[in-house]
């Protein structure tokens, strides 16, 4: 059973870095700014769905992982490089558990060009997707203190109606 999703991300990031010798930029959720260093393998958990119920009362999850292989199109041989790196990522994730209690990685769909990230339009980008099934620990980590959330109903919204808002935390406890 995984303690949390960070454990999964850290293991995949570290495992891919080990298996893709010479490629230092393997990152989970990298900040994509005006420019990025390439080549880059950017990993993320794209989707969670219910897994196969084994009758134990636990709720297994199937996590769909994505790796975007990003290459500068101006580098000589970029078209082959993006495909080569995609094939290496496919080979690395196939059957891999990253040392965790999860099912072996299984590719879904095909590895192909990824036209769906406008922030990466100036790069060559290929997408590799695979799944793992796992149980996630029952303990929920406390979230960091966020901003105050108050609930208002239109049209009584805005600063002039601040006193009419309902404090969400108090409302959840059964108080108006």
Across the structure, where does each feature detected by a protein language model lie?
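A short, hydrophobic beta-strand-centered structural micro-motif
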Residues: 37-48
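Charged, amphipathic alpha-helical segments and their flanking helix caps
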Residues: 1-31, 48-176
